[in-house]
Design a protein with these regions (language model features):
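Conserved strand-to-helix beginnings and helix N-cap segments that scaffold or border functional pockets
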Residues: 65-68, 95-99, 193-196
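Sec-exported extracytoplasmic/periplasmic mature domains
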Residues: 66, 72, 76-79, 106-110, ...
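Solvent-exposed loop/turn segments at secondary-structure junctions
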Residues: 59-63, 90-94, 120-125, 157-158, ...
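C-terminal cap of thioredoxin/glutaredoxin-like
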Residues: 141-218
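Polar helix-capping/helix-linker motif
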Residues: 9, 131, 154-155
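Structural microenvironment flanking redox-active thiols in thiol-disulfide oxidoreductases
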Residues: 79-108, 112-140
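Extracytoplasmic/secreted envelope proteins and their assembly/folding machinery
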Residues: 68-75, 98-102, 115, 132, ...
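Extracytoplasmic thiol/disulfide redox context detector
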Residues: 2-93, 170-171, 205-218
Length: 218
């Protein structure tokens, strides 16, 4: 029965080669230029000790609306060293109005309520949310009276937030939404290969890549 030992060795080696091949395939599952882009000029993140993920979106984008159903459960699973936040797109006057809506909600501390509310109003109810009276009515539904809404939406803080969002659009060369920027270095957008349901898989891959880099830097 001496042949048993060589047979076991061959099986063991075959299994090791399989694991090696599988791990390499996993490591190379997402590659630059195919699944994500490397930004020409990295941007400064708001907390260098964390891996930053910024979602550039628009309330009027149906793909952003679809992604939101993935974003909500996903962000609850993020490690403490990952900083996730949203930045509203600002290509044209309509988007800038919606950006002002978003940053007004942030200033009022009702961002988590307004996001699903605005998506529902625009995507499912067919509302535009662009006129003053329409926006006043919309915010009143969240307990914000007209005077308070007008004061906040025209404040220096909200004006500056919209301006900064516009600057980020230019800096990151955003041409479509949803787009996610990982740690100021990588841009992940929907493509034929990366659909809405896979965007966060690519982001997770890049998060781990940056977490390893940060860990090796300390």
């Amino acid at each position: 029965m001496a042949f048993i030992k060589p047979l076991l060795i061959r099986k063991h080696l075959a299994w090791m080669f399989f694991l090696l091949f599988f791990s390499c395939a996993q490591a190379e599952e997402y590659v630059a230029g195919r699944h994500y882009e490397i930004l020409d000029s990295p941007s400064v993140t708001r907390d260098p000790s964390k891996v930053e993920v910024v979602e550039v979106f628009w309330f009027g984008c149906n793909h952003c609306y679809a992604l939101e159903s993935y974003i909500q459960p996903w962000k609850k699973t993020l490690p403490k060293d990952v900083d996730f936040w949203k930045s509203h797109a600002t290509w044209n006057p309509t988007l800038k109005i919606h950006a002002r809506l978003f940053y007004s909600a942030k200033a009022l501390g009702i961002e988590d309520k307004i996001i699903p509310g605005a998506f529902t109003a625009i995507q499912r109810e067919g509302r535009f949310l662009t006129g003053n009276s329409e926006l006043e009515y919309f915010f009143r539904g969240f307990g914000v009276e007209k005077e308070k809404y007008l004061s906040v939406s025209n404040s220096f803080g909200v004006n500056n937030a919209v301006k900064q969002a516009d600057n980020r659009m230019r800096q990151w060369t955003i041409t479509g939404v949803p787009t996610l920027i990982v740690n100021g270095k990588y841009k992940v957008s929907g493509t034929r290969e990366v659909g809405t349901d896979r965007l966060l898989d690519v982001v997770d891959f890049l998060i781990e890549k940056e977490r390893r880099f940060l860990a090796s830097s300390y």
